[in-house]
């Protein structure tokens, strides 16, 4: 249970913003900043919702493919190169699941770089941002409601969408962290 929101930023690039609450069936903990991170070698920024273990394996064990605009279109790259790289890391660490004959994972992700972004869902389906924004996790509906359909959005707009999700969505809370494809550095909203 979480919320991660990515938007096309009015200042260029993509903003990725997340809450910091993690939970298990018996408790919750606020202040976990590792729902978002930067893969500095590839220039990707990534946000995750779901299993912490799955996110850790994807973060530290995935051999990220390099996107080259002259060789790939974005959906094809995501489906044929990124998804298999993630599946390979999960398989290697025993986290690739089979649900009624469909390979699954217990997390969802947003991956962004430059002006590009998409989400990978639990069944490895890839969703492209139709209106310049993507939200995942239990707070996604509140975030979409706060953003509306007309973008681009400032970083502050995206932070506000996550803040609103912390007020009403189950399993969303704690401090808010952000990263942009321009900066590749995680910051707390308190430090802005």
Where are these regions (language model features)?
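C-terminal catalytic subdomain
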Residues: 163-170
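Conserved short S/T/G-enriched processing/targeting/catalytic segments and their helical context
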Residues: 1-96, 102, 127-159, 172-191
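Long, charge-patterned amphipathic alpha-helical coiled-coil/hairpin "stalk" segments used as oligomerization
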Residues: 102-135
